[in-house]
Regions:
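Phosphate-group recognition and catalysis centered on beta-loop-alpha active-site segments
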Residues: 1-266
């Protein structure tokens, strides 16, 4: 296990805390995926805590009645692949959705409220992936209210970059460094990047960029996901990337749980 379960929840606004946790580990797709722990389920979140992750990535979508719920799903297939229901998520209310069970599992679709309450109780930080859509002011306001209710303001980042999200969640989450500011930092310009983080694929982050970001106050979280690599080499190429980026000083990794052993998680 990497993280002591009694350790305090990560403070993403504290540079010393980030460095002390290195490598900071974020469980992709809502936690550790296992036989009875589908992605974005409460069971997967619990397993992330058991296995010592610092944070979980939560995929957030809007139900028909405006309630934020957790779901990733297969592109264009709605709820059929995961829950065996011939509907799209946005066609059902939150009450209808949480009544649905994932196929071959006892786990149900969860609301963001349920997930944040569980993360708070387990000492897990949160990476929000707010899936694009209409993103109404009311919907984003509900997300902000839930983050406040569960005291997530110092332990949450988002990888969503839609223009509507920043003003709605500005006091509750950290946002990614913009491509423009990244370029300026890499060109040697002094750019204030404190309170921001870099997020992206390993192939997008040269070692020199890691150093440039750190000089200007930002930290990095690199995604290591199986779909980033060819099917015949998803293990070997990922391990190469992890070794390189660890040596370069990268602070965090968002990983599929199959890569846990690369960080001493079994």
């Amino acid at each position: 296990m990497k993280r002591d379960p009694d350790e305090e929840r990560i403070n993403v606004r504290d540079a010393d805390c980030i460095r002390a946790r290195r490598p900071l580990l974020v469980a992709h797709r809502g936690g550790v995926i296992a036989a009875n722990a589908p992605e974005n389920s409460l069971g997967a979140i619990r397993l992330a805590a058991v296995h010592g992750y610092d944070m979980v990535e939560l995929d957030v979508r809007e139900a028909k009645d405006g309630v934020p719920v957790l779901f990733h799903g297969s592109s264009g297939r709605g709820l059929w692949m995961d829950c065996g229901v011939p509907h799209f998520l946005e066609e059902l209310t939150a009450e209808e959705l949480v009544a649905l069970r994932y196929r071959a599992s006892t786990e149900h679709i969860a609301t963001l409220a349920q997930a944040l309450a569980l993360c708070a109780s387990l000492g897990l930080g949160v990476m929000l992936d707010i899936k694009s859509g209409a993103l109404s002011e009311g919907y984003l306001g509900r997300i902000a209210d839930l983050l406040r209710e569960h005291d997530c303001g110092s332990s949450t980042v988002t990888i969503a970059t839609d223009a509507e999200i920043r003003p709605a969640l500005a006091d509750q989450v950290l946002f990614p460094v913009s491509k423009e500011d990244e370029a300026r930092a890499c060109e040697g310009e002094a750019v204030s990047l404190e309170g921001q983080f870099w997020f992206g694929w390993a192939a997008e982050l040269p070692n020199a960029t890691v150093a440039a970001l750190q000089r200007n106050g930002a930290f990095s979280i690199v995604s290591i996901n199986t779909f980033h690599y060819p099917a015949h080499a998803w293990q070997s190429l990922a391990r190469q990337d992890i070794r390189r980026l660890m040596a370069a000083g990268v602070e965090g990794f968002q990983i599929d749980s199959v890569y846990g052993d690369c960080f001493g998680i079994v």
